[in-house]
């Protein structure tokens, strides 16, 4: 098993964790953000100091790589790459929507065997970033930007119970009313939930090229024009 620094900044929450041998031993979270530019550097410094003071040499840095907030992802990935360069560590990039699935799989044993998971990240209006996975986190449908209406995900709902969660799911409750649709509240991507996926990546030696790795934005960033003053 390994000692890993985890960084998650894809949504308004900012979180950092250290895991050792598959258990979280340190975590810092600000759930009331976005405060990534202010908080992330402090959290990472505290995490590194904790690991150093407890004689826990890091084996890798894992970062949640999107989709999500353009600014949050850019800050998180830049920080992760900086630590990798500074300490000569390998980089792990984890899909944010898979990270969201971890607490559902860990803490919701009531899920039936044929259940499908649909993590959602709020985009804008009725749009979400979403994917569909089975319980083994194998993709049933790849990540996409969906405009949700009454017929969304019907091809899956007609055959399986589908569990929707994440900060994009709340606004979909009134639209997705199929009897096989289930909603789980209170789920968000957090650094403390990254360790199972990061451990798997280390076991498979699934590392990213630190020099060229970029976040998965899914959509290009479009800056809004400032309003003209009258």
Residue map of PLM features:
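Stable alpha-helical structural segments in soluble proteins, enriched in small hydrophobic residues
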Residues: 47-51, 86, 104, 194-202
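DPxDG-like acidic metal-binding loop motif
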Residues: 62-96
């Amino acid at each position: 098993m390994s000692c890993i620094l985890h960084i998650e900044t894809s949504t308004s929450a900012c979180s950092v964790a250290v895991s050792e041998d598959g258990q979280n031993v340190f975590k810092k979270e600000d759930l009331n953000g976005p405060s990534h530019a202010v908080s992330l550097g402090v959290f990472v410094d505290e995490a590194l100091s904790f690991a150093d003071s407890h004689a826990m040499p890091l084996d890798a840095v894992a970062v949640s790589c999107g989709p999500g907030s353009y600014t949050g992802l850019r800050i998180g990935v830049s920080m992760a790459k900086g630590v990798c360069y500074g300490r000569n560590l390998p980089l792990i990039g984890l899909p944010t929507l898979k990270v969201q699935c971890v607490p559902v799989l860990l803490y919701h044993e009531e899920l039936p065997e044929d259940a499908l998971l649909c993590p959602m990240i709020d985009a804008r209006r009725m749009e979400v970033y979403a994917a569909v996975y089975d319980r083994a986190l194998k993709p049933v449908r790849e990540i996409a930007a969906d405009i949700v209406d009454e017929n969304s995900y019907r091809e899956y709902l007609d055959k399986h119970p589908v569990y929707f969660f994440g900060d994009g799911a709340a606004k979909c409750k009134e639209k997705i009313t199929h009897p096989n649709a289930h909603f789980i509240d209170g789920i968000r991507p957090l650094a403390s939930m990254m360790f199972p996926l990061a451990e798997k990546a280390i076991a498979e030696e699934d590392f990213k090229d630190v020099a060229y790795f970029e976040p998965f934005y899914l959509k290009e960033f479009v800056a809004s024009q400032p309003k003209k003053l009258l």
